[in-house]
Structures are given as structure tokens and as C-alpha cells.
Amino acid sequence: TTVPKMLINLQKQNKAISYAGCITQLSFVLLFAGMENFLLAAMAYDRYVAICKPLRYTAIMKAHLCLVMTLLSLCISIVDALLHGLMILRLSFCTFLEIPHYFCELYQVIKLSCSDTLINNILVYTMTSTLGGVPLGGIIFSYFKIISSILRMPSSGSRHRAFSTCGS
């Protein structure tokens, strides 16, 4: 939603975005950002299993587990996007306001509201720290275990193979 809007704005020399367009853009950005975080964590777990438990890789990383991790990522991201979207819709705005950018950000919309935004701010900080911190923690834990496993390998050839597995 950002690129088509940007192309229209470049042609019309207009940087404003409508309220409906802003809500739509917010929802898609939150959806895809959340999915990206959780999918990166799933990829880190995949690398962890491939390096630290190579003999059990096919038993652990079955198609069913990959599907569950992907669908869980999608469901959590949809709930997050809907929750923020619905909380933005309950805000009231005193006057007709335009966001002077081609891209609509959650913080900008909350700042433009003339109603109480305490719940929105709490939700933003809670969801951001949870949906950012949990995947980040999983990624850090996975790569910590990978690095410690690689450092315990006796030969440099096996270390090289392990690092090349991480890079692929």
C-alpha cells in the first residue's frame, strides 16, 4: 500500500493520505512486520535444530511443525493488526487533519488524536515489546546455542560446515 500511494503522490505533488488509507496501511504494516519477526525466529530455530541436533533434524522439523509455526505467526500478527486498528478507530479527532507524509505511522495517528490515548499508548508499548522481544529472545537464544555448539566442535572442517549451514 505504500509504494502505489507514493507513486500517486509523486505524480500529483501531494503528500496527504486519507483516514481510510491510513488505517489500511497501518494494518498491513503491522501484519507484515509481526509476521516477519516471528518467521525470522522460526528460521533461527530451524538453523538451531540443523546445527545442534543434525541427526534428529528430519524428525523435529516436519512439515507439520513448519505449518504450525507459519500459521501461528500469521494468527498472532492478524490479532495484533486488528487490535491496533480497532483501537485507532475508537479515537476521535478534533478537526480534519492530514498526516504530511505518504506513509502513515501508528505514533503519528495517536499523536493527532484529541481523545485520551493512554490505552493506545499502553497497547503500543506492550505489544511492541512482546511481539518484538519474544522473537528477538528466541533468535538470540538459538544463535547463542549455535555458536556455543560450533565452538565445541573439535575440527575446523566441521566448524566450517556448520557456519556454511548458518549462511544458507
UniProtKB/Swiss-Prot annotation:
It is found in: Cell membrane. The chain crosses the membrane at residues 26-45, 68-88, 122-143, 166-168. This is Putative gustatory receptor clone PTE03. The keyword Lyase does not apply. GO terms for molecular function: G protein-coupled receptor activity; olfactory receptor activity. Tongue specific. It is a multi-pass membrane protein. Disulfide bonds join C22-C104. It comes from the Eukaryota. The lineage of its organism: Eukaryota, Metazoa, Chordata, Craniata, Vertebrata. One of its GO terms (biological process) is signal transduction. Belongs to the G-protein coupled receptor 1 family. Residues 46-67, 144-165 are cytoplasmic. Gene3D superfamilies: Rhodopsin 7-helix transmembrane proteins. PANTHER family: OLFACTORY RECEPTOR. Possible taste receptor. Its main location: membrane.
